[in-house]
Amino acid sequence: MRVLQACAEIFPLLKTGGLADVAGALPPALRALGADVRVLLPGFPPILDGLQNAEEVAKLSPPAALATGGARLLRGHLPACDVDAYVIDAPACYHRSGGPYADAQHQPYAHNHLRL
């Protein structure tokens, strides 16, 4: 079976709550059952920092880039999670002050529904 797991965060690279724990534990568990697992993640800086052997596999156009700055799809390996990954690298969406979901004043980003 081939599995593509889409998630907003993954332990140990980016964690705000329990979602990251599950997202980090599920790929190895599925692989142990014989599945071919990949993950799809947003390009938050900690995720990009953990991505090894990254190569661009596609250029993305709006709405993926929210009409500013462009975006690209990277493929690489996340050794901290021992999983191959696709990462949406869109700096206008994911390189922000504050956390992944809210700004430095803890206000949710207005366009989270587009980013995630």
Language model features by range: what are they?
Residues 1-116:
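Catalytic cores of nucleotide-sugar-dependent glycosyltransferases that transfer UDP/GDP/TDP-activated
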